[in-house]
Amino acid sequence: MMVDNLNVSREVTHALLNYQNLLLKWNKAINLISRNSEKDLWERHILDSLQLLKYIDFSDIIIDMGSGGGFPGIVLSICGVKNTVLIESDKKKSVFLAQASKLSSNKIIIVDERIDEKFNMNCDILTSRGFSSVTNILGVTEGIKIQKKMLLLKGKNYEKEITEAQKHWVFDFNLHNSITSGEGKIVEIFNIKKLL
C-alpha cells in the first residue's frame, strides 16, 4: 500500500481504507472517479493527494477547489489538516463529501456552490486536482485571499498551462516532481497579481 514512507499512522491508514470503501460504494451511483482507475485508487488518487503533506502544515487553513471525490481535501483532512474547506458545486458529490467528512476528526466545511471572482474567503493554501486550467483557477479564485500559496496537482500539460496563465497573471512558482506520475508536477504558485 505505499503509505509507509509517508509516515502515516495505523489509525490514519484505517480511516483512508474506510474512505476508499465508501468512495467505491458511491462510485457505483455517481461518477466520483473513472471506473478504470478504481483498481489503482491508492496510487492514482490517495497517494497522489498524500504527497501534498510535504508542503502543508496541519495548522494551515486549506481550500480545496473542485473537490469531487475528495481529492486531495478529504485525504489531507484525514491525515491531520485541522481546517479544510471543500468547494464542490455538484450537489450529489457534495452529499458524498458530507458522508466522507465523517471519517476525519478534523473540521471540514463543504461549500456546495459554483464560485467566481466575487467569492470572498481566506485561506493559507488553496489546493486543486483535476479541476481546471491554471488560468481558470486563478480567475475563479480571485476573491480568495491566499496567505501562502496554491498547490495544484497537474498533468503533462503543466508547462503549457503556466505559459498561458502568465499572459493574464504575474506569479512566482516552483515545480515539484510528482511521486505518482512521471509526466505530472505539483505546481506551487505564490505572489499572485493580475495583469491590468
Residue spans of the language-model regions?
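A short glycine-rich, Lys/Arg-flanked "PGG" loop and its adjoining helix->strand segment in the class I
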Residues: L138-M150
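Conserved SAM/SAH cofactor-binding pocket of Class I
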Residues: L50-N122
